[in-house]
Each structure stands twice: as C-alpha cells, then as structure tokens.
Amino acid sequence: MKIERDERRFDFHDIGLAIKRAREASGMTQEQLAYIVDRAPRTIMYNENDGQHPSFNTFYQMVTMFDISVDQYFYPSQNSGRDRKSVV
C-alpha cells in the first residue's frame, strides 16, 4: 500500500505569531526563549516573524511551554472544544 505524499507546505506564520504573543505576554525575551530551547535568538526571530519551520523538538517545546493549542492551525475548519489558551 503506497501512501500519497501531500506536496503542500504547512504555513507556520500564524503559529509563529501565536508563539511570539505568548512569549511577550509571559514577559520573556527572544534571547531567554532561545536559551531555554537551545537555539540562536535569530532562529526564534525567524520562527516568530517569518514563519520559518522549527525542528519538531523546538516546536513541541515552545507550544507546550506556552500552552498553545495547535489544533486550530492544523484543523482550521474544526472547532476543538479543549480548554487551552487561544493566543491568536
């Protein structure tokens, strides 16, 4: 059984903005977040502002740290009834 490959690339920009808003709301700088997730501050800047895709591990660390539900970004047509923060 062959799995069809979807060639669309996920637009990370909205999640990046959600991470930025959550980081700012917590009073954390890009430099502090970069230190915590072991990345360069410019990498955090690119993730937040330019929609650059982080590694899965970095992505997971950031969304769990700020309690960001990603369902609304991956499944925009579905309403997830979860009690997690909606930052955007």
Task: Please give the residue ranges for each predicted region.
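Helix-turn-helix/winged-helix DNA-binding modules
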Residues: 14, 25, 51-54, 65
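Alpha-helical DNA-recognition elements
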Residues: 46, 50, 61, 79
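Short, charged recognition helix plus adjacent turn
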Residues: 1-4, 74-88
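A short, Lys/Arg-rich alpha-helix, primarily the initiator
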Residues: 1-25
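Recognition helix of helix-turn-helix/homeodomain-like DNA-binding domains
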Residues: 37-54
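DNA major-groove recognition helix of helix-turn-helix/homeodomain DNA-binding modules
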Residues: 57-72
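Short basic helix-loop element that most often maps to the first helix and adjoining turn
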Residues: 17-32, 36, 61
